Amino acid sequence: MKYNVYNDWPRKNVIFTDFTPSMIDAEEFQKIVKLLSEKVPDDVDYIVSPEARGFIWGSAVANHLGKGFIPLRKKRKLPEDAVMASYDYKTEYSVDTLEIPKCSIKNSKCFFVDDVLATGGTFKAAKVLIDTLNANLIGGVVIYNIGLKDIVRVKHLYFAELPLKK
């Protein structure tokens, strides 16, 4: 897997892992999408991913599996009347807000896809937002787990199981 690591970016004591080299290489990109897709249970209805890098991986997985894709947007990226719910959460270096667009997914099974897991805050925010819509976030997968500290437990968790090699 091709990636770059930047220490102390965007702040001191933060390790930024960039998978752009894997996206540029078409074969590598397809390989990662396939590996991520293999972790998604067959009965999942929607792939859910946070803005911004999660959109790349999540939408590719949704397309690969023929599933719907629900984008979790950053604050003020949607018109106010298009937002169903929002949730404030902590990342390793900031406090952010995720918003979920109005959609009818009641009783659906959703699966989280993102590039990196650092604190579990984004995953927790996704769980809260999906719960708000009376749907179920049944699991998640990331390419790289920087250092899971506290995670909301769900049935299918695949954090740091992909073969990450430089």
Q: Model-predicted segments: where are they?
A:
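Short, glycine/charge-rich flexible loops or terminal/linker lids adjacent to PRPP-binding catalytic cores
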Residues: 67-111
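Short Gly/Thr/Asp-enriched flexible loops that form oxyanion-binding sites at enzyme active sites
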Residues: 56-65, 127
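PRPP-dependent phosphoribosyltransferase catalytic core
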Residues: 124-166
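Short, ordered loop/turn segments at secondary-structure junctions
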Residues: 52, 74-76, 146
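Short glycine-rich phosphate-binding loop at a beta-alpha junction
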Residues: 44-51
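Conserved acidic residues
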Residues: 45, 108, 138
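Acidic, divalent-metal-coordinating active-site segment for phosphoryl/phosphodiester hydrolysis
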Residues: 114-127
